[in-house]
Amino acid sequence: MSNQLIYSGKAKDIYETADDGIVLISYKDQVTMLNGAHKEMIEGKGSLNNQISALIFDRLNRVGVSTHFIKQLSETEQLNKRVAIIPLEVVLRNVAAGSFSKRFGVKEGQALDEPIIELYYKNDALDDPFINDEHVSFLKLATDEQIAYIKQETHRINAYLKEWFASVGLTLVDFKLEFGFDKEGMLILADEFSPDNCRLWDNAGRHMDKDVFRRQLGSLTQAYETVLERLRALDQ
């Protein structure tokens, strides 16, 4: 690959292209947990995440959500708009699970009365602390108007994807989003949407996401392949 590497992350590498407003994203087979403290290579995982994320972002583009996604290039690569990421992880929860259940003593699997949005400061050295709007303002991560827009878009994305996943027998338990500014200064959805950064349960309650790896529940790629097959079948 002749493109110059800009950034190497836990799950993706980012490369320059001839257009300074566009980057090439290459998905890795690496899977991590505990904020990258534990790593493994699982063959085929990068390809599955790339294809799932491309499918979902294409859908979101078509329903009017502004995203960084341009097109899928290969099984492991896609073109995206270059984005200056806001260092915030925006988590939306529909069902109690994971850290939410532990933090608030809520039984895993309990449906929430309304979707709940949580904000986390994206900072590996601080272990991505849980913060609120006032912290965001103090740290000058985003303006009040930008946070309001991010939350509005997150709820809109949730409403659409929750219905789409339900139509293929999957419950969208929770997910993490990242937003940033493109070359023109527009605030758009970025990063990825895959079973690496969301929780999906099938109608039998089986995990179809990275919890398969975290909890050693079976084959991660088999779970991801099932998600891709179901979404692809409905998209045709």
From Swiss-Prot:
<dbReference type="InterPro" id="IPR050089">
    <property type="entry name" value="SAICAR_synthetase"/>
</dbReference>
<keyword id="KW-0067">ATP-binding</keyword>
<keyword id="KW-0658">Purine biosynthesis</keyword>
<dbReference type="GO" id="GO:0009236">
    <property type="term" value="P:cobalamin biosynthetic process"/>
</dbReference>
<keyword id="KW-0547">Nucleotide-binding</keyword>
<keyword id="KW-0436">Ligase</keyword>
<dbReference type="InterPro" id="IPR033934">
    <property type="entry name" value="SAICAR_synt_PurC"/>
</dbReference>
<dbReference type="GO" id="GO:0004639">
    <property type="term" value="F:phosphoribosylaminoimidazolesuccinocarboxamide synthase activity"/>
</dbReference>
<dbReference type="Pfam" id="PF01259">
    <property type="entry name" value="SAICAR_synt"/>
</dbReference>
<comment type="pathway">
    <text>Purine metabolism; IMP biosynthesis via de novo pathway; 5-amino-1-(5-phospho-D-ribosyl)imidazole-4-carboxamide from 5-amino-1-(5-phospho-D-ribosyl)imidazole-4-carboxylate: step 1/2.</text>
</comment>
<dbReference type="InterPro" id="IPR018236">
    <property type="entry name" value="SAICAR_synthetase_CS"/>
</dbReference>
<dbReference type="GO" id="GO:0006189">
    <property type="term" value="P:'de novo' IMP biosynthetic process"/>
</dbReference>
<dbReference type="GO" id="GO:0005524">
    <property type="term" value="F:ATP binding"/>
</dbReference>
<comment type="similarity">
    <text>Belongs to the SAICAR synthetase family.</text>
</comment>
<protein>
    <recommendedName>
        <fullName>Phosphoribosylaminoimidazole-succinocarboxamide synthase</fullName>
        <ecNumber>6.3.2.6</ecNumber>
    </recommendedName>
</protein>
<dbReference type="InterPro" id="IPR001636">
    <property type="entry name" value="SAICAR_synth"/>
</dbReference>
<dbReference type="InterPro" id="IPR028923">
    <property type="entry name" value="SAICAR_synt/ADE2_N"/>
</dbReference>
